[in-house]
Amino acid sequence: DVFYRQQEVTARRARVEVEVEIASVRDLAEAVVTVASPGEGIEASVTAPLRSGINKVTVPLDIASPKLWWTRELGEPHLYEFRASVAAGDASDSRTTRIGLRSLRLVRDKVADGTTFYFELNGEPLFAKGANYIPCDVFLPRVTRAVYEKTIDDAAAVNMNMLRVWGGGVYEDDVFYELCDERGILVWQDFMF
């Protein structure tokens, strides 16, 4: 598995830690783990030994002047395509992931009559416009990519920039989250109960 942790994201710099989880059937003296986004000119590698079992290798990325991900009304929802690859002897594997680089924070400042409650996206105040989302169908296998596309496109057409996924539903298929990323729509994900 591959996990991207955005440590710091500003218009000037993005620091991302990429944790690559590697299952090895035996001890290996050396494995090369590379994370790259060739179209963006980004690449970093780490060489590490592997032990039999599960290994975690962290590859730091430092990106100057990153193209930030924005909600649809604030800018372009730019997505980087990163490829994480592992090479050890004759064995190799890779995984490609698309992610948007952004900073998002909930602002809770004290004011005269209470506390603020709004989001900042990449340092800009965000007026959240959205809806609660429940599963498109109780029979999940009937929900196709086309159904997800229509649902997300309809939300975008009425200028929504955030969908709250209801906690009494399900964790949606990856295509739901990918389409939201592409369309510049934030997801407020409730935990299931």
Name each model feature, range by range:
Residues 168:
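Flexible loop residues that form catalytic
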Residues 184-186:
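Proline-centered loop/turn at the N-terminus of a beta-strand
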Residues 1-163, 171, 182:
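Secreted/periplasmic carbohydrate-active enzymes, especially glycoside hydrolases
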Residues 189-193:
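Acidic, His- and aromatic-enriched active-site or binding-groove loops in soluble protein domains
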Residues 177:
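Catalytic cores of alpha/beta
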